[in-house]
Swiss-Prot record:
UniProt keyword annotation of Membrane present: no
Family designation: Belongs to the RNase Z family.
Cofactor note: Binds 2 Zn(2+) ions.
Positions contributing to Zn(2+) 2 binding: 66-67, 212, 270
Cofactor: Zn(2+)
Name of the protein this chain belongs to: Ribonuclease Z
Functional description taken from the UniProt entry: Zinc phosphodiesterase, which displays some tRNA 3'-processing endonuclease activity. Probably involved in tRNA maturation, by removing a 3'-trailer from precursor tRNA.
Entry keyword set: Endonuclease, Hydrolase, Metal-binding, Nuclease, tRNA processing, Zinc
């Protein structure tokens, strides 16, 4: 099953040449999940031939404009293209009011259901139980309320070795084996053991999106062992003091977070427009965390191929 991340925008507060404001698209099988929606989001979707009609859920981290100013424009375009399927938006208090005011005064009547979930909990919470994935918030520390998001693939079924499968098992008992549960008869006698019949289930994959934040160890437990981690890195370490004052992170700090969290791979982004060249970010971070990648426009990453923690040392 596909589990692929597309980077649509990598700039911070203001866009710069070739770089746009925060927006990502996570493809899980045939479902599209959008994470933040900066001004150029719908343009970037079109540019990279990512079909906006497949987007079913949109997650907004916080109410700084570079993370949501493209949302109403995208919803309006979906409407113009005749969308009928519902869309689910998750975001902080106030975003639903902003959306409704913009739609009201532009006299836009959506022809599809828009469901809004307000994220008010200051701790981590389970916000979406989807057939393919569970989504949790990651409480971050920014100048205003801000959440990251953790996407965890649903546990995978065990695979059966059919040559070892007893012939007298019912479909219900076979389903039980696939869930990793041994099968016994009504007298408690063993009919089938998982360890003898099943091959180990593949590990479920995970992706964590850490938007604007200063480093705070309180969110580390929520990203522990994640396969793919996106962490903002607005500044290089030479501006660590400014990063702290503005509640942002440096490339060096992002790498230290990934190392502490024992992540598989790290993507860095949200680069300040003061930097034309992003290569120094990669050099700074990869000196601490080997498997670091620049999350620049048009890049994509598969959430798979787990890298061991030791290999990142």
């Amino acid at each position: 099953m596909d589990f692929e991340l597309f980077i649509l925008g990598s700039s911070s507060a203001t866009p710069s040449k070739g770089r746009y404001q925060s927006a990502q698209l996570l493809k899980i099988h045939n479902d599209y999940f959008m994470i933040d929606c900066g001004e150029a989001a719908q343009y970037q979707l079109s540019r990279y031939k990512l079909n906006h009609t497949k987007i079913s859920h949109i997650f907004i981290s916080h109410l700084h404009g570079d993370h949501f100013f493209g949302l109403v424009g995208l919803l309006s375009t979906m409407n113009l293209y005749g969308r009928k399927n519902p869309i689910h938006v998750f975001g902080p208090p106030g975003l639903d009011e902003i959306i409704q005011i913009q739609l009201k005064y532009s006299e836009t009547l959506l022809q599809f259901p828009l469901h809004y979930t307000t994220l008010e909990n200051e701790g981590s919470e389970h916000i979406l139980d989807h057939p393919l994935v569970d989504v949790y918030t990651i409480p971050l520390e920014h100048r205003i309320r801000c959440n990251g998001f953790l996407f965890k693939e649903k546990p995978k079924s065990y695979k059966l070795n059919k040559s070892k499968l007893p012939e007298d098992l019912s479909l219900l008992e076979i389903a039980q084996l696939k869930q990793g549960i041994d099968v016994y008869d009504e007298n408690g006698n063993v009919k089938a053991l998982v360890r003898e019949i099943c091959m180990p289930a593949l590990k479920s994959r995970s992706y964590a999106y850490c938007s604007d934040t200063k480093v705070n160890e309180q969110y580390f437990p929520y990203i522990k062992g994640v396969d793919l981690l996106y962490h903002e890195s607005t500044f290089l370490d030479e501006l660590a003091d400014r990063a702290a004052k503005t509640y942002h992170t440096t490339a060096k700090q992002a790498a230290q977070v990934a190392k502490e969290a024992e992540a598989g791979k790290l993507i860095i982004g949200h680069f300040s427009s003061r930097y034309y060249d992003t290569e120094p970010f990669l050099l700074e971070a990869s000196s601490i965390f080997k498997h670091t990648y620049l999350g620049t426009e048009g890049s994509s990453f598969y959430v798979s191929d787990r890298i061991s923690h030791e290999d990142n040392s």
